[in-house]
Regions:
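Polybasic, low-complexity association/targeting segments
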Residues: 1-34
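Conserved Radical SAM active-site core
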Residues: 32-68, 76-138
């Protein structure tokens, strides 16, 4: 089972992407690890690290960073499961076993902050999935 960026170079144009996102596929590599049987890590580059939460509600106006999409913890009640469908992955087993890793999130954050006139007062880490995946401990 593939994802929409399979076989693309980092600089490739994804013609099936939403308007304005065509050049953001950025797949570096995918790999399986013996320590985490049945897990697949999809390494991608990201042009941005910060996300501005729209609205006025609970988190409205806040800034977040999510270094991953998907989560090894596999909590069945996780509200973020549905976001995997945006990647043409399923929100069930794929969310638990196919984790997208943004490998350059620190560099993207540095570049983004250097361009901002007014820096965020606070940034919340890992609001969509756990910011520390078990594989990082290896």
């Amino acid at each position: 089972m593939g994802v929409r960026w399979d076989g693309q170079r980092v600089d490739a144009i994804d013609r099936d992407a939403l308007p304005g996102l065509e050049g953001r596929s950025g797949l570096l590599r995918t790999f399986d690890t013996p320590e985490f049987r049945d897990m697949q890590f999809l390494e991608v580059t990201s042009r941005t690290a910060l996300n501005k939460v729209p609205g006025n509600g609970f988190m409205g106006g806040a800034w977040t960073i999510n270094p991953y999409r998907g989560c090894q913890h596999a909590c069945v009640y996780c509200f973020a499961r549905g976001t995997h469908t945006y990647l043409e992955l399923d929100s069930g087993r794929d969310f638990d076993t196919r984790v997208v890793v943004k490998t350059n999130v620190a560099q993207a954050l540095d570049a983004e902050l250097s361009r901002m006139r007014e820096r965020p007062e606070r940034v919340m880490l890992g609001t969509n999935t756990d910011p520390y995946q078990r594989a990082e401990g290896r």
